Regions:
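Positively charged n-region of N-terminal signal peptides that target proteins for export
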Residues: 1-6
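Bacterial N-terminal signal peptides
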Residues: 8-23
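Aromatic-Pro/Gly-enriched surface loop or interdomain linker
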Residues: 24-94, 100-101, 191, 199-234
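Short alpha-beta junction capping motif
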Residues: 42, 94-133
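An acidic, glycine-rich "communication" segment
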Residues: 50, 132-208, 214-225
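Extracytoplasmic/secreted envelope proteins and their assembly/folding machinery
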Residues: 57-64, 110, 114, 132, ...
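Surface-exposed patches in mature extracellular/periplasmic domains of secreted proteins
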Residues: 73-83, 125-128, 146-154
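Alpha-helical scaffolding within the catalytic cores
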Residues: 77-84, 106-112, 176-180
Length: 234
């Protein structure tokens, strides 16, 4: 695990700076008392199409609690729920989406997600088993020319806080085969991380919700820390 002495301070500054194109002029944000008191929160994407965007309900609150305790980032107690057309989308620097079913982006939603990611935002998509069939085609609407890259084991996302020499861990056994950590890049920056065939969200839920052993649950939480730490530091 990385030393917290300088990393926590750096991540705190990034998290509270809101590194996405602001909805207000910078002068207005600087003068706003609420901006100064901002705490980091993960934004759960409320997508359409019929998929259960709300699945693993205890996962994000648990991740945010551990970000505070392990990394030292002040976090909100609950997740933020945002649609891609939400006026406050650009005030949320880190988005998360998961589910078992169909994901659909309208043309306007796809364009807005693209602008969000091009402006410094980050999306972590975690397939709960069943999302993949629609998610990747929908992301083609967002970045038509981008190709998914299976991130190599030496990528920094696997070593920035906790060390994963074998890449993303397999947490929940929905079907056989290895776990994959896939990325979409824009101008050399990783803007979308897609955890596929692993279900990190199952492993970060409350104890007893899923039949995952303690070591798998710990690996899931450590991987979640890495994804957020990486996103906030790049």
């Amino acid at each position: 695990m990385r030393s917290l002495s300088s990393l926590s301070l750096a991540l705190l500054a990034v998290a509270l700076a809101i590194p996405v194109a602001p909805a207000l002029p910078s002068s207005a944000r600087a003068a706003s008392p609420s901006a100064a008191a901002e705490r980091f929160a993960i934004g759960r994407v409320q997508y359409t199409g019929g998929g259960d965007w709300y699945s693993n309900p205890s996962s994000l609150p648990n991740i945010q609690k551990q970000l505070s305790e392990r990394v030292g980032i002040p976090t909100e107690g609950e997740e933020r729920r945002v649609s891609l057309l939400d006026p406050n989308l650009f005030e949320t620097p880190f988005l998360y989406m998961n589910g078992h079913g169909t994901v659909t982006f309208s043309d306007e939603e796809a364009e807005r997600l693209r602008r969000y990611l091009e402006s410094g935002g980050f999306l972590w998509a975690d397939d709960n088993y069943g999302m993949d069939e629609s998610f990747r085609p929908q992301m083609r609407k967002v970045f038509p020319d981008a190709e998914w890259i299976d991130l190599p084991f030496d990528h920094e996302i696997y070593h920035c806080f906790y060390d994963f020499p074998g890449g993303i861990p397999k947490i929940h056994e929905h079907h056989g085969g290895p776990a994959h950590g896939l990325g979409l890049f824009h101008e050399g920056r990783l803007v979308v991380y897609y955890s596929y065939n692993t279900d990190i969200g199952d492993g970060t839920e409350d104890v007893g919700v899923h039949d995952d052993p303690a070591d798998k649950r710990e690996m899931a939480m450590e991987m979640a820390m890495n994804v957020v730490v990486y996103a906030l530091s790049h």
